[in-house]
């Protein structure tokens, strides 16, 4: 019996070898994966292993900064074109709506301005950009609010009244300046007017009617001066191709309604040089420099984010930030151009 047992034990297959012991790191990883996934299968690394992001070195950072700077310069040029061609029109439309609402309230209340000073406060000058009249020219489909002052900043919001001239509808000569192309280009079709076309202006004093007598450019003879007590309006804008002015275009129109008295005009010494026809605004350089410095800082920051964080995360932050700065610079840059463009 004992011999039979020994024979069976010898003929039985040997037991399988014990599994190889796992390294401590592998055991810990398996334990963590099992605890996190509830015993699910562990995630295996890709065949080539995980790709590590290269370290941020001064060379890569400098190259990224240069690339971001060139991109920002290109976007700035594109943004300026988009601002002049599209966004400035939206700016003009919004400003006109606000100006019309404000003037309508003043007309209804009888507090619309009729001179260079604030109504009921002769010691205070009317602020630049205040709405003073509504100008209509049916022949070219124009209806716009006229503002006080003729700086480039004022003319972004609509045509401006030259403060050294009388208000429209008053006895004397009233001068209105307006842009040809940018910011709505309200005076872009003045060259289409012909003698006999009508012009109407609504102010706090009157509803004045005018009739065009002539269009003139540099070198053309001046029209005869209006008689004493008569009214005239002169519309002024850039002449020539859009954004390539060759001079100044003036439209003279005599008043056919009864002029109202004028309380006076602002002295020439109070007028800023930036309010003259085709003037530029050098004060726009300061915000341009400040916005430009901020763009340089953003270029450096974006290059670091690109290399240290990731391109898609960087784009999410870069697009709104650069867009805002580019449009802000474009708005200020247009003030360096002649105010009638």
What are these regions (language model features)?
Residues 3-6, 49-52, 56-288, 333-341:
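Solvent-exposed, non-transmembrane regions of membrane-associated and secreted proteins
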């Amino acid at each position: 019996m004992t011999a039979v047992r020994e024979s069976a034990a010898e003929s039985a297959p040997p037991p399988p070898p014990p599994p190889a012991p796992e390294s401590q790191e592998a055991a810990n990883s398996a334990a963590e994966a099992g605890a996190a996934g509830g015993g699910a299968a562990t995630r295996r690394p890709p065949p080539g292993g995980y790709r590590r992001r290269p370290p941020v070195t001064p060379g890569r950072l400098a190259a990224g900064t240069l690339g971001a700077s060139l991109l920002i310069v290109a976007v700035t040029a594109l943004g300026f074109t988009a601002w002049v061609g599209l966004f400035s029109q939206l700016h003009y439309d919004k400003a006109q709506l606000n100006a019309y609402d404000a003037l309508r309230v003043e007309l209804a209340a009888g507090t619309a301005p009729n001179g260079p000073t604030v109504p009921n406060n002769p010691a205070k000058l009317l602020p630049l950009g205040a709405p003073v009249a509504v100008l209509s020219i049916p022949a070219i489909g124009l209806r716009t609010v006229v503002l006080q002052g003729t700086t480039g900043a004022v003319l972004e919001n609509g045509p401006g009244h030259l403060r050294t001239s009388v208000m429209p509808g008053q006895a004397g000569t009233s001068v209105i300046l307006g842009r040809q192309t940018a910011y709505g280009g309200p005076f872009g079709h003045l060259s289409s007017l012909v003698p006999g076309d009508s012009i109407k202006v609504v102010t706090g004093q009157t509803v004045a009617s005018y009739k065009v007598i002539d269009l003139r450019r540099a070198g053309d003879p001046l029209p005869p001066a209006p008689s004493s007590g008569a009214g005239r309006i002169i519309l002024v804008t850039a002449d020539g191709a859009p954004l390539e002015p060759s001079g100044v275009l003036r439209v003279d129109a005599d008043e056919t309604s009864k002029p109202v008295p004028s309380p006076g005009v602002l002295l020439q010494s109070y007028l800023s040089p930036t309010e003259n026809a085709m003037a530029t605004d050098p004060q726009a350089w300061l915000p341009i420099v400040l916005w430009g410095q901020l763009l340089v800082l953003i270029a450096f920051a974006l290059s670091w984010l690109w290399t240290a964080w990731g391109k898609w995360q960087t784009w999410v932050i870069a697009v709104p930030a650069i867009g805002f700065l580019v449009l802000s610079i474009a708005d200020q840059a247009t003030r360096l151009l002649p105010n009638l463009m």
